[in-house]
Amino acid sequence: MLVSYNWLKNYVNLDAVTPEELAAKITKSGIEVEGVEYIAEKNENIVVGYVETCEKHPDADKLNVTQVSVGEETLQIVCGAPNIAKGQKVAVAKPGAVLPGNMKIKKVKLRGVESNGMICSLQELGLEEKYIPTDIAEGIFVFPEDEDIEVGSKVDEWLNLTDAVLDLDVLANRPDALSMLGVAYEVAAVLDQPIELPTKNIDYIDEKVSDQIEINIESKDLNPYYAAFMVKDVVIKPSPLWMRNYLMASGIRPINNIVDITNYVLLEYGQPLHAFDFDRFASNQIVIRRGVEGEVIQTLDEQERKLTEDNLVITNGSEPVALAGVMGGANSEVTDKTVNVLLEAAYFEATAVRHTVRQTGLRSESSTRFEKGIDPNRIVEAGLRACQLMQRYAGGKVLQGFAEENHLDTKSTKEVKVPLTQVNQRLGMELTEKDVQSVLNRLKFDFDQDGHTFIVHVPTRRRDITIFEDMLEEIIRIHGYDHLPYTIPQGWVKSGGLTDKQLLQRKIREFMMSSGAMETLTYSLTNEQNVKRLVTPNIDLENSYPISLAMPMSEDHKYLRLSIVPELLRILQHNIARKQTDLNYFEIGKVFISEEQELTHQPTEKLHLAGAFTGLWHNHPWQQDKKQVDFFVVKGIIEGLFNYLQLNISFKQVKMKDMHPGRCAELNIDGENIGFMGQLHPKTANVFDLPETYVFEIDLESVFEKYINVPSFTDIPRYPSVSRDIAFILDTEVFSGEVQQYIQEIGAPLVKEVSIFDVYQGEHLEDGKKSVAYRLMYQDPAKTLQDDEVESSYQQIVEAVNKKFGSYVRS
């Protein structure tokens, strides 16, 4: 938003601050000023001159010799502008003047004729060409004849050349600051000054707008309010000089008085207006409706636009005359021949305007304000202000009242309760009631008091204020952030560090990487096919509902995941398709669980560890061969992890969908299920185009509960250990892990560790049988074990296992 400092002075007294000081104060209060630029440097030697005579140069066809009065003297100036003529008032740079670009004006001779200055164009005075009206862009600038311009006076005074323009970076939550009055309210509050609002004195003729035009809103959801004003017998001509100056300073090119007035009021009130040539309207009806598929309108930029049902259009009952809130149509535009003006002031919903802007690529000052939101209580005010200016500067006759259709609550204001105790508690200050009253009065907010609580009636122009915290921000920014007391932190200052949970995550991550697995980071989003696939058994799928996104990036990223494994499988699939075969991945990430089909509460988030392995595995010294990943490799990784964490993990065979029926186990700590591991079912592997693949997933939240981050001390064994190997012939239905656990129980306390080192099925064994070899480690912490003690325990274990599982020892 470009804000003219001189224009702003019409509403607020700025005598006490320079433009730079004002910019600093506004920025400090919360609206950033990105820069302050002056239109041109102040120059005492550029004055208004009157061309007394204009004659052809005796020795140059394209030059003229003029005698120009500049008040106290008359200067002879040679001028080459094609539009120079006797009787004009022009801008004269006298000798000694310095124009933009460091152009120094001196007395010179041009083709033998002395020239004592320069008659200037607006560009030469420092104005940007893109903002200069097209009718005066070429040649020198000539002051309008109907302006009472004093010869010899400073040009700065008439062309606003010394004006400073503040470039405001207005955030999306402050659309009120996209108008001069909105900025004036802000500045008045910051400087603690009164604000002077425009007056609207209008002499009406004895005709009513409601007798001339009828309004019918068909799309009330997109256009809840529409008002029409009418001004007759206008004279199209250039705008007054002061208005053109303000528009150019604000970055808008002046066109003619009617169009300029609508733009001026747009900038002043923040309310977009549109002027129609009523005589070209071809109807006394205004119908606001959705566009018809294939319908065409030619807009003011002379482009034909094809409409859809998503476009909101203004029509005369039969054909579109404007794209609502974006741009008018060429079939009803104001021209030099316009006599009667129909003026639109409306409230268009942001969604309707935004869609048309995206479709057409047309973005304007009007559409920007509709997209960000306008003040419903300024709609009629802005319309009346435009009628007043058209009466004064276009000689128009204003009809009484206005036609409207209203489905908008334009009067309601929000009430926000502001308890003084909470204000002081939040700010850490001791503000008094008078302090808060002062801030509210400076903001021009009406309020009541109930004891020490302020009931603030927030004006509709401040759409950003809805709750107590919003008012708290207003209080401190107007009272001044520099008044906040400096408070030294009290109590012990604890140095930063990782939490126990973060430390455990780090330990798990370090172990997995040292085991040879690579860490991945996948999307937390998945598709409908995978969202309930391979979920840990401790999640109740019957009562858990996948959480879907309202606006997903794609169908592959529509649901929050319940399991990490499916995304790891997709990574395996991606890499195998690129000829990578030995893949070992793990990930620590969150899964999301909801017990509600319609989400009304925050879902439960759990941290999980997952892994996926295929191909060859190698985490041994470099000289050893790699081995094929199998069930026991993955089981060994998990056992190693929990040994590292000093937690006892047990495995129990389980059947899970998408997992191999004989090679899947659930993981338990102290009888509590925390996850699963095993081989992917061949059918599931085929879905992902994978070879034999093993996966696991562990609920780390359960692990955190069991984990105690205090190292336990165990004496170094003083006496040697003894190992014995034993191979049992078991039925294939018997779980090797169950036998392992049973041996541990029977052999206690002498048997310290039992491990499986070989499994065999095939030749030399009966059908339905398997050979499982176990290694038993014996140790007594108090003495050296004797052979007979070990042998006795060994035989006891053999007899117990054979009896329980129907096995026999392999010879």
Curated annotation (Swiss-Prot):
Annotated cofactor note: Binds 2 magnesium ions per tetramer.
Family the UniProt entry places it in: Belongs to the phenylalanyl-tRNA synthetase beta subunit family. Type 1 subfamily.
Name of the protein in its database record: Phenylalanine--tRNA ligase beta subunit
SUPFAM superfamilies registered for this protein in UniProt: Anticodon-binding domain of PheRS (SSF54991), Class II aaRS and biotin synthetases (SSF55681), Nucleic acid-binding proteins (SSF50249), PheT/TilS domain (SSF56037), Putative DNA-binding domain (SSF46955)
Keywords: Aminoacyl-tRNA synthetase, ATP-binding, Cytoplasm, Ligase, Magnesium, Metal-binding, Nucleotide-binding, Protein biosynthesis, RNA-binding, tRNA-binding
Domain of life: Bacteria
Provenance organism: Oceanobacillus iheyensis (strain DSM 14371 / CIP 107618 / JCM 11309 / KCTC 3954 / HTE831)
Domain FDX-ACB, first and last residues per copy: 717-810
Record-listed Mg(2+) binding positions: 464, 470, 473-474
Start and end residues of each B5 domain: 411-486
Keyword Ligase in annotation: yes
One Pfam family per UniProt: tRNA_synthFbeta
